[in-house]
UniProtKB/Swiss-Prot annotation:
The keyword DNA-binding does not apply. HAMAP family: PSRP. It comes from Neisseria meningitidis serogroup B (strain ATCC BAA-335 / MC58). It is an enzyme of class 2 (transferase). The keyword Kinase applies. It holds the Pfam family Kinase-PPPase. This is Putative phosphoenolpyruvate synthase regulatory protein. It catalyses: [pyruvate, water dikinase] + ADP = [pyruvate, water dikinase]-phosphate + AMP + H(+); [pyruvate, water dikinase]-phosphate + phosphate + H(+) = [pyruvate, water dikinase] + diphosphate. Bifunctional serine/threonine kinase and phosphorylase involved in the regulation of the phosphoenolpyruvate synthase (PEPS) by catalyzing its phosphorylation/dephosphorylation. Signal peptide: none annotated. Its EC number is 2.7.11.33, 2.7.4.28.
Amino acid sequence: MSSPRHVFYISDRTGLTAENIGEALLNQFGNLSFKRHTHPFVDTPEKARAVVEKVNRSRQENGQRPIAFVSVVDDEIRRIIKGADAFQINFFETFLGLLEKELNTEATASGQGHHSIGNTKRYDARMEAVNFSLNHDDGVSDKNLQEADVILMGVSRSGKTPTCLYLALQYGIRAANYPLIPDDLESADLPRMVKPYRDKLFGLTIQPERLQAIRQERRPNSTYAKIDTCRSEVADAQSMFRRHGIPFANTTDKSVEELAVHILQACKLKRRF
C-alpha cells in the first residue's frame, strides 16, 4: 500500500478557508489517504520561506509531490510559496482575476481576512450564539430559553451538542438542546421544559447500531450501551417526534455541516451573518 499523499493548507489568516475548500475537494477521492499539515498566519516572507522548506522536505522524504491549498492575499508571499515543489491550488490567484474581469475593477486588499475580529458585529453575534448554546447544552437551564432560534431534541449521544455549536459558530444561530431521558420517552407528552416552545423543536435520531458503538466507547458494557436499550430509545424518540409533528433528521450518515444546513432549511432559520 502506498504512503499517504501529503497535503498542505497554507494561509495568511486562520486557514479555515483553505481547509474547508480543500477538504471538500479531497473528499471526492475516498479511495486515497492523505496526511494533512495546516500552516495559518503565514503573513511574512520569513514564514513563507519556512513553509516552503517544509513542503520541499516532505517531497524529498515522501517521494510524492505534495498538494498545497493556498489562501494568501499578498503577492510577494504568494510568489515565495509558488517556489515550493508541490501541486498548488491558489484560491486568490485562481479566482480573483476572473472576478476582477467580471466586475470591471481591480481588487483592493482590505488588510483584514474575512475571519478577522475587525468585523465586530459578526464576531459579537457569533460569541453570543456560542455562549447561548453552551448555557443551554443538555437541558441544563431553561433561563431565557424563549430566545432560542431552535431547540434540538434527541437521545443521549445522538449529536446534539456538536450540531448546536456548529450552528452557533458558523451561522450565529442560538441553538439549545435537550436530552431525551427514559422518563421523557415513557410519557405521551412533551418534556415540561421544552413544551412551551413546540414550534422551535427539531429532533435528531440515529441508527441504533451506530448509537450503540458510540455509547460503548463512553460506558463500556453498561445497560446504557446495550443494543436493546439503544433500539428502544431510538424507537420511542421517533414515536414522540411523529406524535407531536416535530421534524427530525437522522444523524448517522450526515456530517455536522450537512446536518446544520438541513436544520436551517427545515426550520426556515435566518443566519445572522
